[in-house]
A protein has these predicted regions:
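N-terminal targeting signals for export/organelle localization
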Residues: 1-52, 56, 209-210
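Short loop/turn microsegments at loop-to-beta-strand junctions
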Residues: 50-51, 73, 172-174
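Short active-site neighborhood of thiol/selenol oxidoreductases, capturing the structured segment around
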Residues: 63-93, 109
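Soluble periplasmic/extracytoplasmic beta-strand elements of cell-envelope proteins
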Residues: 76, 109-112, 174-177
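Structural microenvironment flanking redox-active thiols in thiol-disulfide oxidoreductases
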Residues: 90-150
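Sec/Tat-exported extracytoplasmic proteins
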Residues: 97-101, 130, 151-154, 158, ...
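Thiol-/selenol-based redox modules, centered on thioredoxin-like
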Residues: 161-210
Length: 210
């Protein structure tokens, strides 16, 4: 009876070590951090992910979470008439596009925070001015509150109307790096070329994750 008890303890210990080892192995595969609240479910870690969405791009096409399924993408927020940080951010996204021009697994989603003005036609002209590649760089519009909610609750950044600012809108300067599972893997200052260069490096690193 004593021997049986010892054997049972050994088996339980072995299983516990195996589960711990699997968890360690999974975490070691993550070459970049995961942003957002983490919830533990038994032995699994459940990370914050981008939820479902449906917006319209500069060609009048519907873009949803299915568009970016199993793809890495960079997300940001802007508006077409912005004369402060947006031109610099868009210019830097041109560099990101250029670095992965022939890579269909990398997309860019730029969300307007002024959908009332930024119609499909306006976004199309804006996209042309930055030589955005169709199917790779989507400029998105939709319901204002939906976009603001998406920014705050999914991408964890600011996007809102603000009468206290010269241009009437307040939005984050961050570029968000999203992995194939919809998790936020990096946040970068889109106005800083050094940070944008790091983003490009991190995208290449993220592509090596299994």
């Amino acid at each position: 009876m004593l021997m049986k008890s010892k054997r049972n303890k050994v088996v339980v210990l072995f299983i516990a070590l195996a589960l711990f080892s699997c968890k360690q192995s999974e975490e070691q595969k993550l070459l970049l951090p995961v942003f957002g609240v983490k919830h533990l479910s038994n032995t699994d870690t459940i990370y914050h992910t981008i939820g479902k969405f449906a917006l319209t791009n500069q060609f009048g096409e519907t873009v949803t979470e299915q568009t970016v399924k199993n793809k890495i993408y960079v997300a940001d927020f802007f508006f077409a008439t912005c004369q402060s940080i947006c031109p610099q951010m868009s210019k830097h996204l041109v560099e990101v596009q250029k670095a992965f021009e022939k890579d269909d697994s990398l997309l860019i989603l730029s969300h307007t925070v002024n959908p009332l003005h930024d119609t499909i036609e306006v976004l199309n002209q804006y996209a042309l001015s930055y030589k955005a590649i169709k199917g790779k760089w989507h400029f998105l519009t939709g319901n204002k509150l939906t976009i603001y909610d998406l920014a705050k609750n999914d991408y964890l950044v600011n996007a809102l109307e603000d009468d206290g600012t010269p241009e009437g809108f307040l939005h984050s300067e961050l570029f968000l790096l999203i992995d194939t599972k919809g998790r936020i893997r990096g946040m970068y200052d889109g106005t800083d070329l050094v940070q944008v260069t790091k983003l490009i490096t991190d995208i290449k690193l993220l592509k090596k994750e299994k």
